């Protein structure tokens, strides 16, 4: 009972509310899309149409104009005004499929159907077109009553007795036998009904049979009559022409209006309609004129202005009425503005937007529909705070590009694709920024590891590695035709040339042939890239480290801005064609809407219904970003975070998209969301760039910074490692983080962060540590547990407690700065100074860490360590060999006595020229290495400074310290060593021994000559023979170096004809010595001589009138020289020999000269200068009696018997 009462009360309340509501009909904003009937305000079009219809000659009228120009509205207006004067038949072919086959027949069929089915079947009862008829129940009942009445009347009229049994006691039966006039009239009426009803039934049956029965074939006996079926291939109009004529005969239509025929671009249908019009108007059975009116576009007969187009238009139509468009691109904006002005949205729509966008709209129906749909969408989605301009833009897009709009609902189409492409473009821009970030990070990494201080130092190292820095190097590198080697002056331009090289050829120790820039810059992969190191050094010189770090921060911010960038901004910044596809770029309206942001990333809200409850648009966008995994800027504003929380689930708080400054502050302020807070902290502790960027931004916005830093520190062990090593933050920002961590993080968490001692290292170098944290006890605990080693102690002097704690616990590095403070600002922190100090703790600390002391103190500055303590350090077994090598290479010193240094260091000491250049050290090293010259010792000797110093003393001066044999061995090694350069040998030759005999088989000609020139080879037969054996002329030079000695011992040397010739031809041998030499020649020396040498020897003898031995004379007279040469020699020697010898020599010469030796003879010989000299000498010697000179002969008279 109570439930019924409750419902009754509710019903009454609703009734009262309805009664209170004013019964005012709200004026609708909507407007139908059908043609208007009140557009012809001035009546011009109606008058023109009326004139055409009244003109008997006009049967086809064209109303022409573009789509949307108002043709249908004009016709509607005309029909409204002249509905009594004319009967209008409207035929519209508003189909959108214009590509079907057999188009003309389909059009004719559609026209015929619209005619036939336009009128009631009663109007054209004889039409063969079937149609479904609805028979009402009332009609069925009436027909049945008439049928049964007909039966009863028939029985009554023709067999009344049959009814007596049924109606014996009825009122009817009592009236049958009466003669009452009324009864008679009733009978007559019934008889008439009996006659009329069958006639009416027959008429109906006839109509049915005629309309539905089709006789195609009749067979009688063996004969078949078949109807002609050729009409099946004829057109629809031809096939049903009788139906059309019957239609107009039976109906009253005299004006037929055709619309939308021009959609099909089919000229044939106009031809068929014109023919049909002629048939209708010429038909005798149709007693009226029928006019066809066509609403068509101007270019229906062609899209090019030709004479044929003009003729076709005027041929087809009897009267053409042009229509001036009601709307076009220039006035559509005014029309739409007018509509909006009279709506509740007049103040919400931007006028400039309307003016711009309506340029693309030139159809009134489209314009009306845009407004209608805008009103519906705006009312339906009014619960969400949407931009009306964007709403209108979306509706315009929906109407102008309906197919793409439909695709957008299913994440397809051009609009969807461009927003997808936007993400790809953003990712490409992010990639470019990441590349810049990587480049800067690589630069910073190179700067951190770079140890060199200048480009000159870098050039020297790389050129040395390439082996083209040494002046004596034979290696070179050819860059674009320019050769670079050790002895050229263009080495300073090497790397500048290399940077832009096209072709590179190298000729090096281990590489010959072409090379690449990278190969040369990295010394064939053995060293870091030269140009990267060059950039690093330049950056260090310009102090650009902080600049690079600031650039990194700016790039990270730019990444965040780009990720939040709208498509509108993207289009503005980029070339439109790079954003829009070619297909989309053709759709200018859509491009406009996208370019100006009227269709943006929030388009989903404008095309789908969303139940927002109390969520704002930004809240919805944020929720969607999480659901769709599309990140928004971390600072994105949120309005109702409580409602947002209700829309999210636990797993979503682990997504990167959930990161938002306002959201996290809200969660931190509400303890009930602790689980969500932990999920976000775990997400932030993964070390990703997104997480770190968020932490950096939120740190200063957090409502509880201490709790946030403590949470991050507890979850992220690499927190400080990332900040210090990988973040590339500026120094100031790093200090801010360090202060926050030391202040808010737990000690256990800080210790856990100290991976690879990063935190310890950081604290050790901070000079303002005490200003970062005020809690001294916490500092002490951290310093001890982290084993911090301070790089400097100056800043700790302000706190005596901390300073003493650090010194007592050895929490400082051994370096110049710390030891200088501890040792009271000592000027030079040498090992000797440490040993001589009174601070045993420092001495012990240094000795326990001697390697560190040497590296961080001795090797960092040019401190002169006394030789005694320096040798002590080098000889220490606990000092690392690597450190010793570094000492030798970096420190300036010279070992006076190499023997006092441990042997293993000799090679590097000698190689680095850290040994005093004296023969004692050289010989000691030579003896130590088994009387061999190791390469480092040879390099020491080749050093210009060293060889000059050694040349000041002769090696023989050390015979009291070393055996004579050792001195000879090292001298011989110096002479024979090919590794000792000729330049060095020229200098050292003054210090080595001289040799009575030295084997020269391994000595170069140049060095042999130097030995001769420096008188280190004595003139001995052994040295003479050794030189002659190994060289062409040096034995002669040795002889000429000592001419007097050579002439004195001429017989001790093995000479040949060539030697004799060289000596005779030499300008260095005096004429006197030459004469003595020739006079004492042994004939054996000339046995291997050729005729030229023998002839030259004879010539020299004759020229200088020398007396030679009979032995030599005999040899020369028997030599194969010319007779003239031998006769001239004999002629010159006759005065030096006796007659007996003359006789012997003349006999050796042969006839006719041998006959001169016979007495009592008269001999004839040729008269020439040689013969004349001979007989003259013989006559002077009184060897012949006389001679007489004829013209051609000389007559010689010998002595009488």
Swiss-Prot record:
<feature type="coiled-coil region">
    <location>
        <begin position="536"/>
        <end position="574"/>
    </location>
</feature>
<keyword id="KW-1133">Transmembrane helix</keyword>
<keyword id="KW-0175">Coiled coil</keyword>
<feature type="transmembrane region" description="Helical">
    <location>
        <begin position="140"/>
        <end position="160"/>
    </location>
</feature>
<keyword id="KW-0472">Membrane</keyword>
<keyword id="KW-0812">Transmembrane</keyword>
<dbReference type="Pfam" id="PF20693">
    <property type="entry name" value="YobI-ATPase"/>
</dbReference>
<feature type="coiled-coil region">
    <location>
        <begin position="420"/>
        <end position="459"/>
    </location>
</feature>
<dbReference type="GO" id="GO:0005886">
    <property type="term" value="C:plasma membrane"/>
</dbReference>
<keyword id="KW-1003">Cell membrane</keyword>
<dbReference type="InterPro" id="IPR027417">
    <property type="entry name" value="P-loop_NTPase"/>
</dbReference>
<protein>
    <recommendedName>
        <fullName>Uncharacterized membrane protein YobI</fullName>
    </recommendedName>
</protein>
<dbReference type="InterPro" id="IPR048428">
    <property type="entry name" value="YobI-NTPase"/>
</dbReference>
């Amino acid at each position: 009972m109570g439930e019924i009462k409750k419902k009754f009360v509710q019903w009454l309340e609703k009734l009262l509310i309805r009664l209170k509501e004013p019964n005012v009909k709200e004026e609708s904003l909507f407007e139908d899309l059908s043609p208007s009937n009140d557009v012809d305000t001035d009546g011009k079009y109606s008058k023109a149409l009326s004139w055409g219809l009244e003109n008997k000659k006009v049967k086809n009228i064209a109303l022409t104009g573009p789509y949307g120009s108002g043709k249908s509205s004009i016709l509607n207006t005309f029909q409204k005004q002249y509905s009594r004067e004319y009967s209008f038949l409207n035929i519209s072919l508003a189909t959108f499929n214009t590509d079907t086959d057999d188009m003309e027949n389909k059009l004719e069929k559609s026209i015929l159907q619209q005619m036939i089915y336009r009128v009631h079947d009663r109007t054209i009862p004889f039409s063969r077109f079937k149609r479904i008829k609805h028979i009402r129940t009332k009609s069925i009942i009436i027909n049945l009553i008439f049928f049964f009445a007909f039966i009863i009347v028939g029985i009554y009229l023709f067999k009344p007795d049959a009814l007596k049994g049924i109606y014996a006691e009825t009122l009817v039966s009592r009236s049958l036998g009466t003669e009452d006039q009324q009864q008679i009239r009733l009978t007559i009426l019934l008889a008439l009904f009996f006659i009329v009803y069958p006639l009416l039934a027959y008429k109906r049956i006839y109509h049915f049979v005629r309309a539905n029965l089709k006789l195609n074939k009749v067979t009688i006996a063996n004969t078949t009559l078949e109807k002609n079926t050729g009409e099946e291939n004829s057109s629809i109009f031809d096939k049903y022409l009788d139906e059309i004529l019957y239609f107009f005969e039976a109906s009253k239509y005299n004006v037929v209006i055709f619309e939308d025929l021009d959609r099909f671009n089919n000229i044939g249908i106009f031809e068929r309609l014109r023919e049909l019009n002629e048939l209708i108007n010429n038909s005798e059975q149709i007693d009226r004129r029928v006019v066809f009116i066509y609403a068509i576009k101007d270019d229906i007969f062609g899209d090019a202005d030709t004479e044929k187009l003009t003729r076709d238009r005027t041929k087809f139509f009897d009267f053409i009425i042009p229509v001036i468009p009601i709307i076009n691109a220039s006035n559509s904006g005014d029309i739409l503005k007018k509509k909006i002005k009279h709506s509740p949205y007049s103040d919400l729509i931007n006028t400039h937007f309307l003016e711009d966008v309506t340029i693309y709209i030139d159809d009134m129906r489209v314009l009306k529909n845009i407004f209608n749909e805008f009103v519906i969408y705006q009312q339906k989605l009014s619960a969400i705070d949407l931009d009306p301009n964007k709403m209108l833009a979306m509706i315009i897009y929906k109407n102008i590009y309906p197919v793409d709009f439909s695709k957008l609902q299913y994440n397809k189409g051009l609009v969807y694709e461009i927003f997808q492409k936007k993400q790809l473009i953003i990712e490409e821009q992010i990639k470019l920024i990441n590349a810049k970030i990587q480049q800067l990070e690589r630069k910073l990494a190179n700067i951190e590891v770079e140890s060199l201080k200048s480009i000159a130092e870098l050039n020297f190292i790389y050129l040395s590695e390439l082996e083209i820095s040494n002046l004596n190097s034979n290696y070179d590198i050819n860059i674009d035709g320019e050769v670079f080697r050790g002895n050229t002056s263009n080495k300073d331009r090497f790397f500048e040339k290399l940077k832009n090289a096209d072709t590179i050829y190298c000729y090096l120790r281990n590489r010959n042939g072409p090379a690449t820039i990278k190969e040369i810059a990295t010394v064939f992969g053995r060293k870091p890239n030269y140009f990267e190191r060059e950039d690093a050094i330049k950056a260090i010189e310009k102090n650009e480290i902080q600049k690079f770090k600031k650039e990194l921060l700016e790039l990270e911010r730019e990444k965040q801005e780009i990720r939040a960038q709208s498509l509108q901004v993207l289009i503005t910044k980029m070339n439109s064609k790079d954003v829009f596809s070619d297909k989309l770029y053709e759709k200018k309206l859509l491009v406009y809407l996208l370019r100006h942001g009227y269709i943006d990333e929030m388009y989903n809200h404008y095309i789908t219904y969303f139940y927002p409850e109390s969520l704002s648009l930004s809240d919805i966008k944020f929720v969607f970003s999480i659901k769709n995994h599309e990140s928004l800027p971390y600072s994105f504003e949120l309005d109702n975070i409580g409602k947002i929380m209700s829309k999210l689930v636990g797993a979503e708080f682990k997504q990167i998209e959930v990161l938002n400054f306002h959201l996290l502050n809200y969660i931190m302020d509400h303890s009930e969301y602790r689980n969500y807070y932990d999920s976000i902290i775990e997400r932030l502790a993964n070390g990703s760039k997104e997480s770190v960027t968020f932490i950096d931004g939120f740190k200063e916005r957090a409502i509880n910074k201490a709790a946030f830093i403590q949470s991050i520190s507890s979850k992220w062990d690499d927190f400080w490692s990332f900040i210090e090593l990988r973040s590339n933050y500026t120094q100031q920002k790093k200090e801010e983080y360090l202060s926050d961590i030391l202040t808010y993080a737990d000690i256990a968490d800080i210790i856990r962060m100290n991976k690879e001692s990063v935190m310890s290292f950081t604290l050790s170098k901070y000079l303002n540590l005490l200003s970062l944290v005020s809690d001294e006890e916490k500092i002490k605990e951290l310093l001890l547990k982290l084993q911090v080693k301070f790089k400097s102690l100056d800043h700790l002097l302000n706190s005596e407690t901390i300073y003493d704690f650090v010194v007592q616990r050895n929490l400082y590095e051994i370096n110049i700065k710390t030891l200088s403070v501890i040792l009271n600002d000592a000027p030079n922190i040498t090992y000797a100074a440490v040993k001589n100090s009174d601070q045993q703790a420092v001495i012990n600390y240094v000795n326990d860490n001697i390697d560190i002391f040497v590296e961080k103190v001795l090797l960092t500055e040019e401190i002169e360590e006394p030789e005694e303590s320096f040798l002590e350090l080098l000889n220490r077994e606990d000092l690392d060999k690597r450190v010793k090598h570094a000492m030798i290479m970096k420190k300036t010193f010279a070992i006076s006595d190499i023997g006092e240094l441990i042997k293993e260091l000799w090679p590097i000491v000698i190689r680095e020229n850290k040994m005093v250049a004296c023969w004692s050290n050289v010989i000691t090293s030579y003896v130590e290495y088994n009387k061999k010259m190791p390469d480092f010792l040879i390099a020491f000797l080749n050093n210009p400074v060293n060889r000059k110093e050694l040349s000041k003393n002769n090696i023989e001066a050390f015979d009291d310290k070393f055996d004579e044999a050792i001195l000879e061995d090292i001298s011989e090694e110096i002479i024979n060593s090919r590794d000792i350069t000729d330049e060095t040998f020229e200098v050292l030759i003054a210090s080595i021994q001289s040799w009575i005999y030295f084997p020269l088989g391994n000595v170069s000609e140049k060095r042999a000559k130097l030995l001769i020139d420096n008188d280190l080879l004595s003139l001995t037969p052994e040295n003479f023979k050794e030189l002659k054996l190994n060289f062409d002329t040096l034995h002669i030079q040795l002889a000429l170096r000592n001419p007097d000695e050579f002439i004195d011992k001429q017989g001790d040397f093995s000479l040949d004809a060539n030697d004799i010739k060289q000596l005779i031809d030499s300008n260095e041998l005096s004429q006197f010595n030459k004469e003595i030499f020739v006079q004492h020649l042994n004939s054996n020396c000339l046995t291997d001589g050729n005729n030229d040498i023998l002839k030259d020897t004879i010539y020299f003898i004759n020229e200088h009138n020398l007396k030679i031995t009979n032995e030599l004379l005999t040899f020369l007279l028997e030599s194969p020289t010319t007779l003239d040469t031998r006769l001239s020699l004999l002629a010159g020697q006759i005065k030096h020999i006796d007659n007996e010898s003359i006789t012997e020599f003349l006999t050796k010469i042969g006839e006719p000269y041998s006959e001169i030796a016979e007495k009592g003879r008269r001999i004839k010989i040729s008269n020439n200068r040689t013969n004349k000299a001979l007989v003259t000498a013989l006559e002077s010697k009184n060897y012949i009696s006389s001679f007489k000179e004829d013209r051609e002969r000389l007559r010689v008279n010998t002595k009488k018997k």
